[in-house]
Amino acid sequence: MDVSRVPVDTATRGPGGATNAYLLGSDSAILIDPAARTDALDDAVADADPSHVAVTHHHPDHVGAVADYADACNATLWARASHADAFERATGVAPDRTFRPGDRIATGDGHVEIVDTPGHAQEHVAFAWNRGAVVGDLAVAVGSVVVGPPDGDMRAYLTSLRRLRARDFESIYPGHGPVIDDPDATLARLLDHRLDREQTVRRAVAEGARTVEEVLDGAYDKDLTGVRDLARATVRAHLQKLAVEGDLDFDGDRAEP
């Protein structure tokens, strides 16, 4: 599969302040996650002349130029079935067609499969072929992914990491940062990181933390300057997961062992 990655400067808190747009296929290509209109992406799109436009999920730093490029290329605009209305609200344009996990989109280099990868967002999908996948905000090469309400679901996120790891890809292509050429190690690291954080959240509650802020302070031993809001969202997602699994009680404000 021919893969072109074009980093696009956006108002994102992802690594490098950019979102990766991708073009898959040397003919009848798919443009994925066109976050903004830039000269570099214009040039790449002009060379590839994509037949399809799609996104991994609807967050603003992934959809900013969807309508522009779908119109400019006269391309088929895709959205996830059952999320078409949310897609239209996020992009300002209705999809031409919808897909479901397991569906495939044809390119000149072969078919691209839609893989269900919720967690960072409910509608999140990856676009996979035999050796790789565009994975959006499921994974990053360095650091971790924010998973928090209202869109995030920690149980779903962990399942998605395991699902992708089972595919044994050679490379995966994230929404932010460099290409990941060691997918198994990276996905294992992200899983371990989340499970370790779950244990620190559980321990904080066991030791008397009750409010989200108290759990946050007890679960993290590093300086959270500039990212405290992101860490707070992640703590909420962990508390929700633990509550659903019966490990503690959490009403959205207070946790009890």
Regions found by a protein language model. Give the residues of each.
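Metallo-beta-lactamase
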Residues: 116-118, 122-198
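Conserved beta-strand hairpin/beta-sheet module of binuclear metal-dependent hydrolase folds
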Residues: 1-45, 125-141
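Positively charged, polyanion-binding regions of nucleic-acid-associated proteins
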Residues: 191-208, 234
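Active-site HxH/HxHxD metal-binding segment of metal-dependent hydrolases
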Residues: 10-17, 34-108
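C-terminal regulatory/interaction regions
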Residues: 206-257
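Core dinuclear metal-dependent hydrolase active-site scaffold
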Residues: 6, 23, 102-129
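Residue-level marker for buried hydrophobic side chains located in beta-strands
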Residues: 30-32, 54, 113, 132-134, ...
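Divalent metal-coordination and catalytic microenvironments
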Residues: 24, 33, 57, 99, ...
